[in-house]
């Protein structure tokens, strides 16, 4: 069996991890073992939070639409039901943007939805 020297492979692997750990504080960016643990934790959190971000924004949009709808005397759930009946296909993001940036247009949407009832 011939001898296999793996120094270059190990160095490359460690350098890759330390490069990912750049910006971490203290030994978390200097020592391989702690840096490796922190990089794995950071990647795990990033993966989880990319999915969580979608849920968080949906909750935010619903809260904003509900607040704006209640100003016009209607709840969020009633508004969404009436929008479906009126065949108005605005998604939650669009409705939330309208509620904040153009309240008159949002009022028109609510009025149209109420008329279709």
Swiss-Prot record:
Transmembrane segments: none
A GO molecular-function descriptor: rRNA binding
Keywords: Ribonucleoprotein, Ribosomal protein, RNA-binding, rRNA-binding
SUPFAM superfamilies xref list: Ribosomal protein L20 (SSF74731)
Stored InterPro entries: Ribosomal_bL20, RIBOSOMAL_L20_CS, Ribosomal_protein_bL20_C
Keyword RNA-binding (UniProt): yes
Domain of life: Bacteria
Pfam families given in the database record: Ribosomal_L20
UniProt key word RNA-binding: yes
Coiled-coil ranges (or none): none
Gene3D superfamilies: 6.10.160.10, Ribosomal protein L20 (1.10.1900.20)
GO CC terms, sorted: ribonucleoprotein complex; ribosome
GO biological process: ribosomal large subunit assembly; translation
Family, per entry: Belongs to the bacterial ribosomal protein bL20 family.
PANTHER family: 39S RIBOSOMAL PROTEIN L20 (PTHR10986)
NCBIfam families the record matches: rplT_bact
Function: Binds directly to 23S ribosomal RNA and is necessary for the in vitro assembly process of the 50S ribosomal subunit. It is not involved in the protein synthesizing functions of that subunit.
Protein name per UniProt: Large ribosomal subunit protein bL20
Protein encoded by which gene: rplT
